[in-house]
A protein has these predicted regions:
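Glycine-rich nucleotide-phosphate-binding loops and adjacent flexible coil segments
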Residues: 1-142, 147-177, 183-185
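C-terminal regions of RecA-like/P-loop NTPase motor modules
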Residues: 31-34, 60, 64-78, 83, ...
Length: 293
């Protein structure tokens, strides 16, 4: 299981869709066919909101890279989520949405199941996991696990243990977003100590990731390097980092635990959550630890 932690209202879903779900859904076999299926169980975003995020991610990462799949040849078209919510779409955005909806309708046919569950019930979730795993849904997205009261701490602990057990018994790949504890808000360095009842989740997670916004002034005080394959070495990219443009934000991704690779890494991304788009800038060092033990 992969655990992805961030504070409330900090675009957890908007990041996870293009970073994790889209690559799975776009994975092709040797014949170029897509088979991977995803079961989504959510308690905050309903299906309409989620599919809007999915559509914008497809526009950013599929439409703009494979234009021959669509009815026009113009590069780098985007649609603003704000324009969708406020019913202010331009003619170009309307055309783009029509194209991507047709593409998604065919591309995701019988490959995505969405279940909205306002209050997570471990027994009910287990029932859905078992039901859909028999239908080939081996990838699961749980959005969002959170604990704000003592009773919810116990629920999250039980849910974590159930997800670990069922995933191992049925060979499932599970990604679960986790809301970080409010009393840790303001921390610069994020890790498992930012989660209420952290032990129950971190013990079962194969990978633990944490995510927060970072101001350009803070970035200037850090070292940022990126591996240059042409030179076969890391090079400094701090001087190339620009001030964020309209609707853009810089985000830090903390790799706290990784049983399959390097951990204790911090990656800097430039993101636009209005268009559901991001790009990696480099690896960060020089950030002092300011948390618990």
């Amino acid at each position: 299981m992969t655990e992805f932690g961030a504070y409330s209202g900090t675009w957890k879903t908007s990041y996870c869709v293009p970073m994790f779900l889209l690559p799975i859904l776009n994975a092709e076999d040797e014949e170029g066919k897509k088979h991977e299926k995803i079961l989504i169980i959510a308690n905050e975003q309903n299906k309409e909101v989620f599919m809007t995020i999915m559509g914008l991610a497809y526009i950013s990462f599929v439409l703009n890279r494979h234009r021959n799949e669509f009815s026009y040849e113009t590069k780098n078209r985007y649609v603003s989520r704000k324009h969708i919510n406020e019913n202010m779409l331009t003619d170009e955005e309307k055309e783009t949405l029509i194209d991507v909806k047709e593409y998604i309708k065919e591309d995701l046919k019988n490959r995505v199941q969405f279940i909205f569950m306002p209050s997570f019930d471990p027994k009910e979730i287990e029932m859905y996991l078992l039901k859909y795993s028999r239908m080939g849904y081996k990838n699961v997205f749980i959005d969002t696990m959170k604990a704000e009261t003592k009773g919810e701490y116990h629920l999250m602990s039980n849910l974590s243990q159930m997800l670990d057990r069922v995933s191992k018994e049925n060979n499932l790949r599970i990604l679960a977003t986790v809301q970080l504890a409010l009393h840790t808000y303001g921390r610069k360095y994020l890790d498992h100590t930012c989660i209420a009842e952290a032990k129950s989740i971190v013990e079962v997670a194969e990978v633990s990731l944490y995510f927060r916004e970072v101001e350009i002034s803070e970035i200037r005080s850090l070292s940022v390097q990126k591996f240059d394959y042409s030179q076969n070495k890391y090079i400094d990219v701090q001087s190339k980092i620009e001030d964020p443009k309209y609707n853009e934000k810089y985000m830090l991704l903390f790799i706290g635990k990784n049983r399959h690779g390097k951990d204790k890494k911090i990656i800097l991304y430039r993101s636009n959550f209005d268009k559901v788009w991001f790009t990696e800038i480099g690896e960060v060092s020089g950030l002092s630890y300011d948390g618990g033990k």
